Amino acid sequence: MRTLWIVAVWLMSVEGNLYQFGKMIKNKTGKPAMFSYSAYGCYCGWGGQGKPQDASDRCCFVHDCCYTRVNDCSPKMTSYSYSFENRDIICGDDDSCRKAVCECDREAAICLGENVNTYDEKYRFYSSSHCVEETEQC
């Protein structure tokens, strides 16, 4: 029964914001978000500390800062409406929380796409034990 509950919770999160954000990342970078960015550098993935390791990691740092600003909107779980039009991401929600979360994800996906050339395999599955420098402020 516990396993069934865990799978149900995971499926709910997959249908929410993180899944949508992953689709945006794939659209802008051509890389699968789960395998390429879920544990990249010091900031891509859950949590974050230390100094961003490259421009791609800095995109995730800025995204974390954006999520901090919209924290009352439960950004990791809030789903929203958006579309792709000629490779542009259009956030289309009238709800202010959903729109704000979508904009955080949109800006991060664009940033990752613009900096895909900085992506370095050595930062994939990067241990947080390497992220010891003083954490920057948002």
Swiss-Prot record:
Q: List the disulfide bonds.
A: 42-131, 44-60, 59-111, 65-138, 66-104, 73-97, 91-102
Q: What class of enzyme is it?
A: hydrolase
What GO CC terms are in its UniProt record?
A: extracellular region
Q: Which cofactor does it need?
A: Ca(2+)
Under Gene Ontology molecular function, one entry of this record is: calcium ion binding
Q: Where is the signal peptide?
A: 1-16
Predominant location category: secreted
Q: Which PROSITE patterns does this UniProt record tie to the protein?
A: PA2_ASP, PA2_HIS
Active-site residues, Swiss-Prot/TrEMBL: 63, 105
The reaction(s) annotated as catalysed by this protein in its Swiss-Prot or TrEMBL entry are: a 1,2-diacyl-sn-glycero-3-phosphocholine + H2O = a 1-acyl-sn-glycero-3-phosphocholine + a fatty acid + H(+)
Subcellular locations according to the entry = Secreted
Instruction: Give the top-rank taxon of the lineage listed in the UniProt record for this protein.
Output: Eukaryota
Q: Which residues bind Ca(2+)?
A: 43, 45, 47, 64
Q: Keywords of this protein's UniProt record, alphabetized?
A: Calcium, Disulfide bond, Hydrolase, Lipid degradation, Lipid metabolism, Metal-binding, Secreted, Signal
Q: How is the cofactor bound?
A: Binds 1 Ca(2+) ion.
According to its UniProt entry, the protein's GO biological process terms are: arachidonate secretion; lipid catabolic process; negative regulation of T cell proliferation; phospholipid metabolic process
Q: Which Pfam families does the entry link to?
A: Phospholip_A2_1 (PF00068)
- InterPro entries, per this entry? PLipase_A2 (IPR001211), PLipase_A2_Asp_AS (IPR033112), PLipase_A2_dom (IPR016090), PLipase_A2_dom_sf (IPR036444), PLipase_A2_His_AS (IPR033113)
Query: What EC numbers are recorded for this enzyme?
Result: 3.1.1.4
Q: Which family does it belong to?
A: Belongs to the phospholipase A2 family. Group II subfamily.
Checking PANTHER family in the record gives:
PHOSPHOLIPASE A2 FAMILY MEMBER, PHOSPHOLIPASE A2, MEMBRANE ASSOCIATED
What is the name listed in the Swiss-Prot or TrEMBL entry for this protein? Phospholipase A2 EC1
